[in-house]
């Protein structure tokens, strides 16, 4: 299912499919937040911002919800409740 990274829930694993290079900070690219890479939601701060991700089972990134909204993803599996 395609969506954006800001709509993922804790435990969701998704594949980054697309983003606008002009809207994504270069530091995220350096840390592996690239199309084709997996991201997993580790934690979401109170009020939903920022969102803490694991990228490719290694880099941990806290991304503002506004930035996560610009990252298109395809959910690979959802958290099991």
Where are these regions (language model features)?
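Short alpha-helix capping/helix-loop boundary micro-motifs
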Residues: 1-2, 23-27
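A structural micro-motif recognizing beta-strand termini
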Residues: 18-22, 56
